[in-house]
């Protein structure tokens, strides 16, 4: 059984891995190359090599109730969508609550992770680290890689003929921090992901003109959904997930298109996606349609060629006097401290069982966390990954044979291509609730809805028709939390708390609304009875 665990990285995945190790009675040591926790979500004015980078205005795309760890709800006064600084505050509260900082060695870089000579029998690893120009070696029973996949910028310059002639400024979105210095410029943003849209919207308030160039377009969603609730509280329910899984794909695709176009007609705005795939990760942006409507952002097709100061697009249109090009073209990733044969990366893909375990190892003592792009919050996802990994390390859960794992990897990749396509940004894409349930099933934490229907029907209804948040995976099994049921029933209270900052008189709309519904139902009954007279 593993005892000593090396955790590489003190971002979101690293912090929750530390907690899960402690929960399972393991002895973790976390190596963090910087001076603080938070990883991607800790904003710094300067870009650092080997570390993820964000712009100052980043807001979460998933709401607080869908993003919190399963036994630690966010404070009720926190906004529903958090600025990066507020999310970092939550991580600090979390780390302090569970006393995690004592396990972290800051400003320590992992140089190498190698199997010990007796790995086939011991499953142990030799980890070499460096701190203050001094290297040290230590032996661990298991390793959890939590270093993320938003580190190496992808800038496909070869796809932009004439870039060498361009006399303006160009850079990857990783280098963007805020609009300072770009006021009054004519700016071209390449890409239509979340970062591209955020940056374009922010720049459009300061620049002379902003253009977005997109090859295939994208659906755009608001964070605000029905009745003003966060989008993911409405979208991610077991009921809606079931419908998406059982209905024919073309029907689901049509339904989603109708839903997306309810906010605005994407075709009229030049944003309608040109792909045949069922699911393409939508862009979450509340302001993009407005900025297009104002004319401060113009949507263009793919760039065919660049000149010294102009962009020529594939439809033949030309935009002159371009000052700046921002490449919001995604990321690739690498693990320089690992042997290539351990986690082989090909075309931004890794062959890991359920995105976590290398299938070829004799002992299951190594796991990658967070190498996934769920259509939902990454935080509950990596938490379940960590809960499973630590139980595998302890020998409480086991992995199938190498052949079974390889077959699963191949099948999963085929399904991913059918659903999401093969673009760079889709290589790690997966369905949200399905994947969470898979992991929960492995550790015995998936709630049995039929069982709850008999012993706690109110809870069963919440589980099936309500938001599928992380609390559901603390109701049963190992790590069961006695506060999980209450957290599920009080989530609406925590959603509304930061919104109700102005006291209002009690609304009298309910009786009127109820009366109208009653009269409507009565009218339907009368119409039905009247119809029967004609038979």
Curated annotation (Swiss-Prot):
Membrane topology according to the record: Single-pass membrane protein
Q: Where is this cross-link: Glycyl lysine isopeptide (Lys-Gly) (interchain with G-Cter in SUMO)?
A: 492
For this protein, the parts annotated as crossing the membrane are: 510-530
Instruction: Enumerate the residues binding NADP(+).
Output: 60-61, 195-198
Q: Which GO terms describe its cellular component?
A: endoplasmic reticulum membrane; membrane
Tissue expression profile of the protein: Lung.
Reactions catalysed according to its record: N,N-dimethylaniline + NADPH + O2 + H(+) = N,N-dimethylaniline N-oxide + NADP(+) + H2O
Primary localisation category:
membrane
Q: Note the InterPro entries from the entry.
A: FAD/NAD-bd_sf, Flavin_mOase, Flavin_mOase-like, Flavin_mOase_2, FMO-like
Q: Which GO terms describe its molecular function?
A: flavin adenine dinucleotide binding; N,N-dimethylaniline monooxygenase activity; NADP binding
Q: Which family does it belong to?
A: Belongs to the FMO family.
Tell me what this protein is called.
Dimethylaniline monooxygenase [N-oxide-forming] 2
Its source organism is Oryctolagus cuniculus
